[in-house]
Amino acid sequence: MTNHLQLSAEEKTFGMLCHLSALALFILPSFGNVFGPLIVWLIKKDQSQWVDRQGKEALNFQISMVIYSIAAFFLMFLLTLTVIGIPLAILIGLGLAVFWLIAVIMASVKANNGEDFRYPLNIRFIR
């Protein structure tokens, strides 16, 4: 979905940062992916409706990914109880991580271009 409004360079930058700040996970392994977008969104949500939408989308996706990761962890744990389940558990974990990284990068690029981005499999907690 393309946004038809004229966006300033600052709006595009902060829209991109809403998504890209999820990479804070690599600095703060415990929920850095949630705190990064949350901080950017809270700072800029009242200054631009578009940045507000991008921040909500990014934050909802990161919260969704935490839930999916917890579910995957339990599934992986159960699978590792069987010898054949270990490779499948590794594939599940890697698949989820790759999906997350690709989605964050795609959203960041789209936002930097001034386009709205909707994450797949996103649970919309914040509307």
Functional labels for PLM-detected ranges:
Residues 1-65, 104-127:
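Membrane-interface extramembranous regions at the lipid-water interface
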Residues 62, 69, 84-87:
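Charged, glycine-enriched surface loops/patches
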